[in-house]
């Protein structure tokens, strides 16, 4: 918790209020898809856990393979939809200063790529959850927190556009 608070403080002081707001507006537009990701993860995990309980390796492989294909399809459709919506958002919905439009578009495209990769990653998370390997999740959580702190330090000390650097690295 303390590392997260310190990271937020570093990012806010590095980006400034305007760029931090731009990042949150654009990120918030994409993060609303989190419910879709959570729903898909729960459905996939349910089937994987059931097959794990049966001990049927062939069924687990079939479920995993079908899940991969379905999630790749959903990821492609989501990517297409988000790229279409991008034109609408940047041509009237978002109120972004003209000099920051390029940086905002880079952040949006980075968020779209991150969303696509997160959707494709769902079946792998479901396998880990089905095995109930919580040590793995706790280690990943600690690593993620430290990685966010490292990204904050990179943003503080970079000479490049801090908003683009932060958007691409997150």
Task: Name the predicted role of every residue range.
Residues 79-99:
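Short membrane-interface helical motifs at transmembrane helix boundaries
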Residues 113-143, 153-156:
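Membrane-interface junctions at transmembrane-helix termini in multi-pass inner-membrane proteins
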Residues 1, 28-31, 66, 75, ...:
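Residue-level recognition of pore/gate-forming positions within transmembrane alpha-helices
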Residues 16-17, 33-71, 90-94, 123-124, ...:
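Transmembrane-helix boundary and interhelical linker motifs in polytopic inner-membrane proteins
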Residues 109, 138-170:
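Hydrophobic alpha-helical transmembrane segments
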């Amino acid at each position: 918790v303390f590392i997260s608070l310190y990271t937020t403080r570093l990012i806010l002081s590095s980006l400034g209020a305007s760029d931090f707001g731009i990042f949150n507006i654009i990120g918030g537009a994409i993060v609303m898809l989190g419910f879709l990701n959570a729903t898909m993860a729960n459905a996939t995990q349910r089937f994987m856990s059931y097959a794990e309980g049966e001990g049927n390796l062939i069924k687990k492989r079939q479920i995993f393979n079908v899940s991969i294909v379905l999630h790749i399809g959903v990821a492609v459709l989501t990517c297409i939809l988000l790229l279409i919506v991008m034109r609408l958002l940047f041509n009237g919905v978002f109120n972004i200063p003209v000099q920051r439009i390029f940086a905002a578009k880079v952040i949006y495209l980075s968020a779209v790529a991150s969303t696509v990769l997160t959707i494709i990653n769902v079946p792998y998370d479901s396998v880990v959850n089905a095995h109930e390997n919580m040590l793995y999740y706790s280690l990943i959580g600690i690593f993620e927190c430290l990685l966010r702190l490292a990204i904050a330090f990179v943003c503080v000390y970079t000479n490049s556009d801090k908003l683009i650097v932060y958007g691409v690295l997150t």
